[in-house]
Curated annotation (Swiss-Prot):
Alphabetical list of InterPro entries matching this protein: Mpv17_PMP22
Gene name tied to this protein: sym-1
Phylogenetic placement of the source organism: Eukaryota, Fungi, Dikarya, Ascomycota, Pezizomycotina
Keyword entries, A-Z: Membrane, Mitochondrion, Mitochondrion inner membrane, Transmembrane, Transmembrane helix
Pfam families reported in the protein's UniProt record: Mpv17_PMP22 (PF04117)
Name used for this protein in its record: Protein sym-1
Membrane topology: Multi-pass membrane protein
Disulfide bonds: none
Gene Ontology BP annotations: ethanol metabolic process
Keyword DNA damage in record: no
Cellular compartments per GO CC: cytoplasm; mitochondrial inner membrane; mitochondrion
TM region(s), chain numbering: 13-33, 52-72, 94-114, 128-148, 152-172
Amino acid sequence: MLSWYKAQLAARPLLTQAVTTSILFGVGDVAAQQLVDRRGLSNHDLTRTGRMVLYGGAVFGPAATTWFRFLQKRVVVPGSTNKTILARVAADQGLFAPTFIGIFLGSMAVLEGTDVKEKLQKNYWEALSTNWMVWPFVQMVNFKVVPLDHRVLFVNVISIGWNCYLSWLNGQ
């Protein structure tokens, strides 16, 4: 299975990572509804899961893939691996995270037919501050030990819990 996935990454990296992200965003929402909200299968909101799947595959997966490639090529401190890692984490947490938390919440509001401004005012700072408690460490590990082609997958696996949280927060 791993060799098949690696072959897909080599042949179609953007598509493979978009599909992977789509699936794992869906898993995060199912976990949020079934394990956190304890909705039960009969009360599972398939539309909500569909929104997460759509956002993961159409927005976050391609964006994260492109972002990690950009960081790899453009954010480099010559002669210092550790400073390069810190610079990438700073860029990720100072630019990508604040932007994509806003895009996530705004996208969910649009797909739900609710007010974007209200959604952002209600949830943005809580999501971003929680992000800053979790993701800087995760990204340090990601940039230090995970090969570029597997960084989105690594983030997606960790994101099962994070997406569970975001899905729960979005549903509040």
